[in-house]
């Protein structure tokens, strides 16, 4: 929403799989008159396939499919800027793997912590909110073999998913 509100020349595609989140996006788009935002009710990366070539992507949730999403984005544009928010330990652990698996430049991972001050008697005490991790980088076309790292990371992710489902295949 924020990016769509910055300029009418920017076109935003919001891919969302949860029906209640799609409805909220629609209400906000109408309320804020965001005619430059298209909402796609789909699961990523499948929802990305038919979209125009992106220049930037913000990933606010991956449903456990971060590497698949990034591979699709890389295939569409190996020069795009990526920003990923992470709150779960599983995604946080994946962020360093992402920076190692894909050919990137200016990769950075940072963590933000927010506190709210609550009054307790005559004291004002900070109450910590959950931290948010932010990973940002720009894809670059990799030297020979860099996509092998991506494929290896995807295979490892698939094997891990199969183990969780009790479907270990050798």
Where are these regions (language model features)?
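Active-site segment flanking the S-adenosylmethionine/decSAM binding pocket
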Residues: 40-81
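Short beta-strand element of Class I
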Residues: 10-13
